[in-house]
Curated annotation (Swiss-Prot):
GO aspect biological process, one term: DNA-templated transcription
Taxonomic source organism: Euglena longa
Protein name: DNA-directed RNA polymerase subunit beta''
Record-stated family: Belongs to the RNA polymerase beta' chain family. RpoC2 subfamily.
Function comment: DNA-dependent RNA polymerase catalyzes the transcription of DNA into RNA using the four ribonucleoside triphosphates as substrates.
Length: 817
């Protein structure tokens, strides 16, 4: 554009590509020429957008042809899982997890197929163009139109088990529409109520960091952050790049062979960072968390101004910029959730599907081992990159290279069908998008009967059997004796359910009932003993199975099964399958009579305290399971607020309570180091944890925020300490002060000030600023004024708010002194 050598970019330019182009142009040609380029891009884009007249019609919504096949495969898998559950091979918890994973896999694969279908058949499709342009729209919104809505979450973020298999073009049936209303309600509630929460978070962030300004060139801190240069994937490379670019190096590093300087002390790491990444070394950089100025940050600790790509200037309001950078995406994405309609999004492992029906082959002896997954299924776990080949015939074949830590579900030589999941790849760097919480599941018996647990037989380990039985209850009645009473022998006869045809039955089982008072006029029923009651051809209870003898000499029943033993489905012979899990109740010469039972597989460490005889729908046991909860930006903002406010939970959980963790860390470090070092080391770990947690929430929503912005807010939260021993100073025990101020004072005192680190939320840190004028403009105005008057405080007018209120020139930019 500005040189004789014209550069051609033969590719589609979406939002990311345009961003990279402008960034590259700014570095090479400067601000003025970049401004002219932006004007030309804007004019070019608007002219062509007007001429194109892009809009969506019903014909643009193209449903992928492979959807029908994917639905059939998912239904087959669900039927297999259901059979395993009914036969007691898997428990209820595993059944629910596998059911959800089946729909997740189908939803994800259908989304990929939808994009692939549009890409192959209609590149100029309006929907495809808008979706992949890089605008705020998301593929999860578009897939509802052309693939399937999938699993839905209610207004609390809880998962509903029944998925919506149709899309909006096909139309929803009455049940699917009813489920869909849950999500629609969630979207409306979030948009109307939660937007205010996102705005209030921004306000608190602004108040916490408004006085953070670039005040000096260098603070000469001895503290630094160590970064190890090591990456394997593109994602790790990208994270290293974001971490390093624009930072100041604090240690000269040379090559081992020729002492050539790779990077020198005080040098800012620019876009030539690739030469650093070629060496397996450790880089030491300055961060805002390491700055030891009592107010504000120095240029060396902050590094580049990300807007210009140059060292930040003195008087720059980096605190306000940081607060806006963190708060703005939350406000925007809160309003975006309305379009998602409550669909449950879950990051699953990447599945490898078979491209056609054929046979699979790979070497079992190399780069992996046979093992079992958490569902007790046989898999092959790869330790290194693994080659697998799928043959349709001698000519057509497909080759895949699986990364380490992948699961292969099929064995070599096994037949695979088109779109069947043959393997899953696992990325250790990815964090789960959905939060998990413990849920107690109640497992109830669907029949009445007798319980039995076989603890000796390993084959039936963890199986809980319920034998079919009916409860017989007798009604009690009484009457005062006024007349003569006749006593007769009364019994309740239980006839045999299974008897041979056309033969007299043996004596039936009789239960004698002892009745003290029976009315004289009660109804009488007579029955003869040994009378034929049941004929096989006439009545057959559905829960009973009878096996008749075959006209063969060979025995059908395996003799190892004795009366009372349990047998699973398909476990008698190969020719004659047992249709249901059963118990042998009668053994004859050539036949066995089986009774249908219902097996339940128990989880480990479940205590059995149930009665011997159980009624239908009686509680068998309770199992604790991990249940997923949809984690969109609404739930994300709640988590971000908890971290920034450093809230204490009512139930003290030391693994999650940051205040307790900080206290424990300080106690442990205090045994090895002095007071100042142990405080800074314990604070450093908490700072790292908060930074990683906040970044993970935003990155799950596709938002990139520079670590610098979050570090500035975290510095405000962790820069205070509480005094435990005042030493020679005029401070009072329990007073909260800045750690850098105390360290400067300790240099002059013989009896040092002893202190402990504390963690303040953004609201509290705003109330502990040096300026009392700033405090009264935020919260607790009367309290702050009275406290300032009693303590005879002086406001030195360092920040923005205090100068603004008094009508002074604010100390930033040209007003900075």
């Amino acid at each position: 554009m500005y040189s004789k050598n014209i550069i051609y970019f033969n590719k589609a330019f979406d939002k990311i590509e345009i961003k990279n182009l402008i960034n590259w142009f700014l570095i090479n040609y400067g601000n003025i020429k970049t401004t002219k380029l932006l004007d030309k891009i804007k004019k070019f884009g608007l002219i062509h957008a007007t001429n194109a007249g892009i809009s969506i019609g019903l014909n643009d919504l193209i449903i992928p042809p492979s959807k029908k096949n994917l639905v059939e495969i998912s239904n087959k898998n669900l039927n297999k899982i259901n059979k395993k559950f009914k036969n007691g091979k898997i428990n209820l918890i595993t059944y629910l997890i596998k059911e959800k994973r089946t729909w997740d896999n189908m939803n994800e694969n259908l989304k990929i197929e939808s994009i692939k279908n549009l890409k192959q058949n209609d590149l100029l499709n309006s929907l495809y163009t808008m979706t992949l342009s890089g605008a705020r729209g998301n593929i999860n919104q578009v897939k509802q139109l052309i693939s399937m809505r999938g699993l839905i979450s209610d207004s609390q973020g809880n998962l509903l088990n029944l998925p919506i298999k149709t899309n909006f073009k096909e139309g929803l049936n009455i049940v699917e529409y009813f489920i869909s209303c849950y999500g629609a309600r969630k979207g409306i509630i979030d948009t109307s109520l939660k937007t205010a929460n996102a705005g209030y978070l921004t306000r608190r962030l602004i108040f916490a960091s408004q006085n953070t300004i670039i005040r000096k060139t260098n603070c000469f801190t001895k503290y630094k952050k160590k970064i190890k240069i090591k990456y394997e994937t593109k994602q790790e490379f990208k994270l290293l790049k974001e971490e390093l670019i624009g930072r100041i190096n604090v240690k000269t590093i040379k090559e081992k062979d020729n002492n050539k300087i790779i990077i020198s002390y005080g040098q800012d790491i620019c876009y030539t960072f690739k030469k650093i990444l070629n060496h397996n070394i450790n880089i030491y950089i300055r961060t805002p968390l390491n700055c030891i100025l009592t107010t504000g940050i120095c240029q060396m600790c902050y590094g580049w101004n990300l807007a210009t790509g140059k060292i930040v200037e003195l008087g720059e309001t980096i605190g306000t910029i940081a607060a806006q950078s963190i708060g703005e995406p939350g406000t925007q994405l809160t309003m975006r959730t309305f379009h998602l309609g409550g669909i449950f999004t879950s990051k699953i492992k990447e599945s490898i599907l078979s491209p056609f029906t054929g046979k699979i082959w790979y070497d079992l002896n190399k780069n992996g081992k046979k093992t079992y997954n958490k569902f007790n299924e046989k898999i092959f776990l790869t330790s290194k990159e693994k080659k697998i080949t799928i043959y349709e015939n001698n000519i057509n074949k497909s080759i895949y290279y699986l990364p380490p830590n992948s699961y292969i579900f099929v064995r070599p030589g096994e037949k695979v069908f088109k779109a069947q999941i043959i393997a899953e790849t696992f990325d250790k760097q990815k964090k789960k998008e959905n939060t998990k919480f413990n849920e107690v599941k109640k497992i109830k018996s669907n029949i009445s009967g007798k319980k039995y647990i076989n603890k000796k037989n390993k084959k039936f380990n963890n199986l809980y059997w319920i034998l079919n039985a009916n409860f017989i209850t007798f009604n009690k009645f009484y009457h005062k004796l006024t007349d003569k009473l006749n006593f007769k022998k009364k019994s309740y006869t239980i006839s045999k359910n299974m008897q041979d045809k056309n033969k007299k039955s043996k004596k039936n089982l009789q239960l004698k009932i002892s009745i003290k008072n029976i009315l004289n006029n009660m109804e009488k029923k007579k029955s003869k003993t040994n009378k034929k009651f049941i004929f096989i051809n006439e009545i057959l209870n559905k829960n009973k199975t009878i096996i008749l003898n075959k006209p063969k000499k060979e025995k059908i029943i395996n003799n190892k099964w004795k009366i009372g033993k349990f047998i699973l489905k398909d476990e008698i012979t190969n020719k004659n399958r047992n249709l249901y899990p059963s118990q042998i109740i009668q053994e004859k010469k050539d036949t066995s009579v089986l009774k249908k039972v219902t097996p339940y597989r128990l989880n480990d460490k479940i205590l059995d305290k149930n009665p011997y005889i159980m009624k239908k729908n009686a509680l068998l046991y309770k199992a604790v399971t991990k249940k997923e909860k949809n984690k969109d930006i609404i739930q994300g903002l709640v988590e971000i607020e908890k971290l920034f406010e450093a809230k204490k939970s009512f139930i003290i959980d030391k693994t999650k309570n940051l205040h307790e963790i900080l206290k424990d860390l300080f106690v442990n470090y205090n045994k090895k180091y002095n007071n100042s070092t142990s405080t800074r080391k314990s604070i450093e770990i908490i700072q790292k944890y908060i930074l990683e947690e906040i970044q993970s929430i935003y990155k799950e929503q596709g938002i990139n925020i520079s670590n610098k912005h979050i570090e500035i807010i975290i510095k405000q939260m962790t820069s205070k300490v509480i005094i435990k021993n005042a030493g020679n100073s005029p401070f009072i025990v329990g007073e909260i002060c800045n750690i850098n101020s105390i360290d400067n004072l300790n240099k002059n005192y013989e009896h040092k000030i002893i202190y402990e680190p504390i963690l303040l939320g953004i609201t509290k840190s705003s109330l502990y600023t040096q300026s009392f004028i700033s405090q009264i403009t935020f919260q607790e105005s009367i309290k702050s004024l009275i406290k300032a008057a009693i303590e005879n405080k002086i406001d030195w007018l360092y920040g923005l708010k205090e100068n603004l209120i008094l009508g002074n020139l604010i100390p930033i930019g040209t007003g900075f002194k």
